[in-house]
Every structure is written in C-alpha cells, then in structure tokens.
Amino acid sequence: MATYKPKNILITGAAGFIASHVANRLVRSYPDYKIVVLDKLDYCSNLKNLNPSKSSPNFKFVKGDIASADLVNYLLITEEIDTIMHFAAQTHVDNSFGNSFEFTKNNIYGTHVLLEACKVTGQIRRFIHVSTDEVYGETDEDASVGNHEASQLLPTNPYSATKAGAEMLVMAYGRSYGLPVITTRGNNVYGPNQFPEKLIPKFILLAMNGKPLPIHGDGSNVRSYLYCEDVAEAFEVVLHKGEVNHVYNIGTTRERRVIDVANDISKLFGIDPDSTIQYVENRPFNDQRYFLDDQKLKKLGWCERTNWEEGLRKTMEWYTENPEWWGDVSGALLPHPRMLMMPGDRHSDGSDEHKNADGNQTFTVVTPTKAGCSGDKRSLKFLIYGKTGWLGGLLGKLCEKQGIPYEYGKGRLEDRASLIADIRSIKPSHVFNAAGLTGRPNVDWCESHKTETIRVNVAGTLTLADVCRENDLLMMNFATGCIFEYDAAHPEGSGIGFKEEDKPNFTGSFYSKTKAMVEELLREFDNVCTLRVRMPISSDLNNPRNFITKISRYNKVVNIPNSMTILDELLPISIEMAKRNLRGIWNFTNPGVVSHNEILEMYKSYIEPDFKWSNFNLEEQAKVIVAPRSNNEMDGAKLSKEFPEMLSIKDSLIKYVFEPNKRT
C-alpha cells in the first residue's frame, strides 16, 4: 500500500477538542509538513488548545469561518494547500434540537463551501471528512456485530442528520468531480481540553466541586469511548494510509454504560457513588446505543493503546490541574442545560428564570410573542413562496377561486430576517413553500450550479421551516419523489411502491441529492407537511414545465412506467390537507403508474392524431443528458386513505388533462 505524503495541510475547527490533538500531533511529528489551522473560535473552541504548536515554524493559525468562500479560496491558493482535514462542525446533540438551523449552516453549508473551493482550485490531493458514528443511528441492544462502513445511514437527530447530509455532499464531489475524499466516522472521544458539555469532563468537574453527578434515565445507555491521543493517531494513519473514496470507522468494541462511567469517576475521586449519583429525567432523544465495527482501520495498522483506567486517570489529572481552562462553565454543568451556547450568542429555550450551578447569579430570558399560534381560531390566510414558479402561481389562482386570502412572500428563503418580516406583516395561518431550484430547462442545470442549488433547496427550505416552527405555523412543503429508483425490493412493474417511511435510494442527480438531504432533515420538524411531487402534469399543455409538454417535444422518449402528479386534482387536495392540519411525509402522486408511451398514445388520440415519436433505452438516454433521471413507483395508500375520492393516474389524466383539451 502506497503511503501518502502531504505538504501543506489545512485543518478546520482546529481549536476544538479532537482537531487540536490532531494538529498538535502532526506539528510535533512532521516538521516538514506545513500545518495551517482555521477556526472561528466559538464557545467550544479555545486557542489554548493549540499552545503546544504556537512556537513551531511549521504552524499557522487563521481565525475565520469555513462558510466564508472568499477566505477559504484565499487560504487554499496562498498557502498552497494540498490536503484538508475537515473537523469543523457543531457537534452537541442537545443543542441541535434547540437550534437545528445553526447545525445545517455549519455542518452542511460550511462543508459545501469547502468542497466547492477544492473543486475550483483543483489542487487538493486529499480531503478527509470527519463524521460521526451517529449517522448510523441507534444500534439494537442485542446486536453482537457493530456497524461496518457500508451500513445504511439512519440518523435519529438533527445533528447526525446534518453530518449524514454533509457526507452525501462529500461523496457527490468525489464522484462528480474526482475529488480524492476519505470519510471517517468516530465514536465518543475523551481526554484533556474537551469542553464540559460532554459527559466525562462534565462529571469530572462536578465531582471536583462536590456536586451530584446527574444520570439521565436509568443510566443504561451504552457508549464506546476512545482516548484522544489514540484518536489523533488514528487520523495520522488515515492521512498517510487511507484509501481514496473509502470510509473508516474510528472506534472500539469496548462499551460502557453511563452509570458505569459515573461509578468509575466517583471512585477516582474517592466518592461513594450511591451518595453522589443523582437520577434525573431522561432526554427524549437519548439513543440507547451506538456500536461500530473497528476492523477496517486496524488493517491499516492502527490499534487502541490507552486502556480505560489509564485514559480516565490522565483526563482527571488534567482537569484538576487546569480547572479554569474554559472559564465559567456553570451553565453547561446543569443536569438539563437550558442554555444553547451557539456561536455569536447564547440561546435559551424558553421564558424563565435560571440559576447558575452555584446558585448565586440569576438571569431572565424572555421569548418574544409568536406571530402565529396553532391553537387559535383565526380564519385562513396563506403565505405562499414561489410566486414566479409554476406551482406557486397555480396555488394563488386556486386561493382566488376558493376565496381564501393569500399573499406571496417577498423574502428570499435563505434570508431569515426577510422571512420573519413576511410573517409579521402578513400574519398567515399557513405557509406554502412552492419555491425551489429545479433547473432550466431541466435538472441538468443543477449539476453546474451546485452552490445555488443547495442555498435554495437545502439552506433556504430549512430556514423557512425553522422560522415557521418558531411562529407555530404549519409549512406545506412541495418536495419531490424523484429521490427513488426501481430496485430489487421495488422492481419495475411489480406494483410495489416506495412508502413514505422509505429512505431515498437515488443519488444520480445533484438536484435529487439536495432534495433527499433536506427531506431527511425536515423529518425533525413537527410543523412540516412534505408533499412528494413527481413529474407534475396539468391541463395547460403549453406550459414548458408540464411533463406531457416536455416529452411531446423530445426527439426520443424512454418508455418506462412512473408515478406522477396531476396538479389539477392534487393541488386542491394540498389546500384541504392544510385545513386538516396534516403533517409528516406524503407521497403526493395519483395512485398507480403510467408509462411514457401510454401518455403519448393518449396525447395522439386526444390532441394530435398525426403525432409520432420514437423510443430509446436508458443507456442511450444517458449519452444526451448530464445527470441520470429518477424512475419509480410511489405507494399511494396513505394519501388514498385520507382522500378516497382521488382518481388513479390514468383516470385523472383523462378527466383533468386530455378530455378538457380534446380536439374535435
């Protein structure tokens, strides 16, 4: 196996816990490498973490944000960076529930900025993306084999969902642009320098001050812990020996219950566990277990060197010698911290009076009055985004027809302040999001405009969802079903459709990747109704966005059955769904499938008797398009149960499209 040797390494988030240990190790061990570290210095970063490297001639610190494209491009070019180790991220699960959008900005958008800079400069020989074991989701309690690197990603919280989303972007840039990427997924790390929002430093600081150790629930939750220096060595191995386009778990199969960790720390301080452990209310999002398979990395020569007892002792000694390293962290030491300490500000989750752990200082946080309230009896008024789009325009016409007051939003989806201004001025009962980038003339546009696509389809949609959540507003979100493709479990012609709970399996186009990513993240919002639209069709056969109009103008057509959405029938249903306060994910297609040839046969029979077309296969189609297209059948049972009067796709085509346009 060839050993990779970098020259100039950029380490993001390097003033944080794990990255600082990696940076210090590389600076110390490889004086011929230039190490440039970038960090915006938020609440869990500390320049003192990099003290061992400050005087080294091969070390350079830059304060800045990875979301700044100009800064990132400047650094890559001026420092002649050939290797990136991307650690920068928001990582605390609890905080992700209180301010998930901040996690999207940091973990997804920031990663995308980095990737785009790599593509533009064209000089990166290794991009190591640091992810988490939490992307695999919760492991069964009785599982004897850990998640291996090819396991399905099933994140269960906003933090892990954003990390999984970032991984998808990294994979996309590896495949689309040949960027030499490597991804790591690590389990819990402990040791010196860690901000005490995490379990072990939190327990150590509490024990040092004679405070109770709070256990969420019964303490049976299981975690695997690696000492920080062992993890730093793992990254050293991945840097030099890791294979491009591979994923490596950094973990251990040795597991410990939270109650066992509390017992061990109590014993280190000579405290009776029975008197110091305090059982508190469990967190509703406290996964029971994460378990990794660690064999792949071991084959590169890495192994865990520090046993639990030694690592815990070293960690305790460091915190007792450096009790003021992080300053006043009393807010983080509470059993259920109310403070969400995100960069730039401190956020509270309610209007209340709180006390620091020592009981001395108090402060009051006041939550502003919500612009909307789901429990009131206001009449309907819709706020619609997507005025210039096809669906947005049709929604406005439907509102006029039904006598429903509505206004179009003036704000841009990615501009939070403008969305808040819209809601305050319009005071809607519901918000409809029909805005988004699909590309003109088709989704191939998104392949060359990825930053714009993610800004609107991911960051923008999540911003609107979060603003609506803060104002107790239901958001009707027009999404896409083009995130699936026929597979072994859902073969073409079988009648087995993809259900609402199924995870996307189509990543052929960047457009679909962004839509799959945002759908996964929106699962965490209980105020969103996601409508999976597919190949939309309307009675307006002159509209270039109409699927029938599109295929009738193609020189050749692939004949394959698909689920589709007849807008004349289903858009009124979306309004009724808003009235019924329906939420969650819905396959927003007419029941059944129709092939492209069947549609064109109807077109010929009803509209243009002399119409002719020819077919070609998917392989031939691939030669004339940039990105592959999604073909699938969606399961319509959920929507049909709610609206049993809904017509099948073929009957709806005839009633709403071809009969009204029939030429005599």
Curated annotation (Swiss-Prot):
Pfam families: GDP_Man_Dehyd (PF16363), RmlD_sub_bind (PF04321). Its cofactor is NAD(+); NADP(+). GO terms for biological process: UDP-rhamnose biosynthetic process. Its EC number is 4.2.1.76, 1.1.1.-, 5.1.3.-. NADP(+) binds at G386, K387, T388, G389, W390, L391, G392. Expressed in roots, stems, seedlings, and siliques. Lower expression in inflorescence tips, and leaves. It catalyses: UDP-alpha-D-glucose = UDP-4-dehydro-6-deoxy-alpha-D-glucose + H2O. NAD(+) binds at G13, A14, A15, G16, F17, I18, A19. GO terms for cellular component: cytosol; plasmodesma. Keywords: Isomerase, Lyase, Multifunctional enzyme, NAD, NADP, Oxidoreductase. GO terms for molecular function: dTDP-glucose 4,6-dehydratase activity; isomerase activity; oxidoreductase activity; UDP-glucose 4,6-dehydratase activity; UDP-L-rhamnose synthase activity. Signal peptide: none annotated. Substrate binds at T132. Pathway: Carbohydrate biosynthesis. In bacteria, TDP-L-rhamnose is formed by the successive action of three different enzymes on TDP-D-glucose. In plants, on the other hand, a single polypeptide probably catalyzes all three reactions that lead to the conversion of UDP-D-glucose to UDP-L-rhamnose. The dehydratase activity is contained in the N-terminal region while the epimerase and reductase activities are in the C-terminal region. In the N-terminal section; belongs to the NAD(P)-dependent epimerase/dehydratase family. dTDP-glucose dehydratase subfamily. In the C-terminal section; belongs to the dTDP-4-dehydrorhamnose reductase family. This is Trifunctional UDP-glucose 4,6-dehydratase/UDP-4-keto-6-deoxy-D-glucose 3,5-epimerase/UDP-4-keto-L-rhamnose-reductase RHM3. It comes from Arabidopsis thaliana. The lineage of its organism: Eukaryota, Viridiplantae, Streptophyta, Embryophyta, Tracheophyta.
